[in-house]
Amino acid sequence: MQLQGLVFVFTIGILLSRVPTGTVSAVDPEVNMNVTEIIMRWGYPGEEHSVLTGDGYILSIHRIPRGRKNHFGKGPRPVVYLQHGLLADSSNWVTNIDNSSLGFLLADAGFDVWMGNSRGNTWSLKHKTLSVSQDEFWAFSFDEMAKYDLPASINYILNKTGQEQIYYVGHSQGCTIGFIAFSQMPELAKKIKMFLVLAPVLSLNFASGPLLQLGRLPDPLLKDMFGQKQFLPQSAMLKWLSIHVCTHVIMKELCANVFFLLCGFNEKNLNMSRVDVYTTHCPAGTSVQNMLHWGQVFKYRKLQAFDWGSSEKNYFHYNQSFPPSYNIKNMRLPTALWSGGRDWLADINDITILLTQIPKLVYHKNIPEWDHLDFIWGLDAPWKLYDEIISLMKKYQ
């Protein structure tokens, strides 16, 4: 892998040597900032909190307790929790400019905004007893995110704010773990006022794109290719590429196309001046086991717990020889859902099936021209989506 990386960097260097001078844009300062620094750069108060899960992981949660102009409002603010998708982190909600990022818009609308980070991403790489160098640290998938991360994060927020309920907004895998947690743990579901679902991925029957090709490979081969620990974390090489490649006018489009190749194409709706910021925060990493789990969702055509590879191991974990399926029909939360017509991962045909399984669906909107990333980075997201989210949450106060 190291040799391939050197060859790639060398090739990029040759390409850049042929790019005319004067075509390099300035590096955005947010490239070198953490999430709290990005929040504060735009004039908002920013906080970082540490949450201990039941199985010993230490997660970071970022908070925007109020907007820029409503410092002195009386009484507690309604709380909203934002949960990122696969290979992402809390920065997703604040890496557009202030009037285009959901995190900032919610704060200005009077909400107390909390942004989670799943175990294994850039901001959640700690454990009480385990080190990231140990295989045991990485023995998790979205099962554990639903079983441990969400309850710990939600209960921490409720204890900190004194609230009894929160709004939950999920994107992609952030929806997946919400559906699992709220259908499996009714006591946790009682703490959610409304479930707002953006581009949910629960099945991959109709999904497409290069990322899905990994799901066709046998698990042992994937482990040989990627190991058993971390998958696609932020790294020094990625940051170098973001700063030295993605700031070139000609190369920005190439950097953006990496995202489009994975998620679907809607080139005109991405703020190209922010590409270097996006790529220095995403991908943010996950475990190889989590990627194997998504491969199993693709192969088995259903949402179920992780298959440990043998009847004996499954029996040890589940008291049965095969992994149990998740029944989201058990979830009884008011749910609003938004989908995209060009979304390769949350395909509209999978969404159509999902809609029939949500007992308390209160709203659905499909945006025909949107891909998977428009929900977090789309230039038109403020008026096509975020205004509706804010209106619905205020309606359900």
Curated annotation (Swiss-Prot):
SUPFAM superfamilies: alpha/beta-Hydrolases. Residues 26-74 form a propeptide. GO terms for molecular function: sterol ester esterase activity. The keyword Secreted does not apply. One of its GO terms (cellular component) is nucleoplasm. Monomer. This is Lysosomal acid lipase/cholesteryl ester hydrolase. It comes from Mus musculus (Mouse). The gene is Lipa.
